[in-house]
């Protein structure tokens, strides 16, 4: 189990999870606010 935790904390695994989350977030933002190059309401 300790080796599995070490594997999950390596940079490629963390980067894959992060970029997957970021891509999903951007897809959902573009679904609700299509073609928004700028977000004037922030």
Swiss-Prot record:
SUPFAM superfamilies for the chain: Subunit IX of photosystem I reaction centre, PsaJ (SSF81544)
UniProt keywords, alphabetically: Chloroplast, Membrane, Photosynthesis, Photosystem I, Plastid, Thylakoid, Transmembrane, Transmembrane helix
UniProt cross-references to InterPro entries, sorted A to Z: PSI_PsaJ, PSI_PsaJ_sf
Transmembrane segment boundaries: 7-27
GO CC term, one of those recorded: photosystem I
GO aspect biological process, one term: photosynthesis
Membrane topology: Single-pass membrane protein
Function according to Swiss-Prot or TrEMBL: May help in the organization of the PsaE and PsaF subunits.
UniProt family annotation: Belongs to the PsaJ family.
Protein name: Photosystem I reaction center subunit IX
Species this protein is from: Chaetosphaeridium globosum
Lineage of origin: Eukaryota, Viridiplantae, Streptophyta, Coleochaetophyceae, Coleochaetales
